[in-house]
Amino acid sequence: MQPSSGRRFTFQTSVYEEACGRLVLTSFIAERRRPGTIIKTSLEREFYRMGSLPEFPLENPFENRNRFYVVDDESELRANDWIRLYLELSVAISDRTTTDHDLSGLRIVSVAIQTMEPPSESSLTAKNATVYIRYIDFCKARCGQNLDRIAVVRRNLQ
């Protein structure tokens, strides 16, 4: 939606599943699409040539504020709703056998963001980042017990 006029615009995007159990959320196109036009692009996918997710850091990413930007304030987590989206996408693909799709029992405890730059608030909007989301899953129906977990998401925007 364009804030100044309140008009809504349609955007063309693409989301796909690379393999069973591995969801790749990709937006090849994130530009305004005019009605009746078909946009065809073949953007380079440098991000996927880099391999799988990096090894989990040896040190606790939620405690090392020299290497990671840590978000543990409730208001900052709410202001960055993309974190919740990343978490829900991660949980949704982790167990395909469940019939319980209620993700309201997830509580984000802390988020650590690693970028190539020194940690700062700008890490929240970094185009290239690895995001570690520590959360508690209260859904006993899905997991059998309350679990303290960490979701790892790599983001690459070009």
Curated annotation (Swiss-Prot):
UniProt-listed Pfam families: protein_MS5 (PF04776)
Superkingdom assignment: Eukaryota
Protein known as: UPF0725 protein At3g57210
InterPro entries: MS5
Family (UniProt): Belongs to the UPF0725 (EMB2204) family.
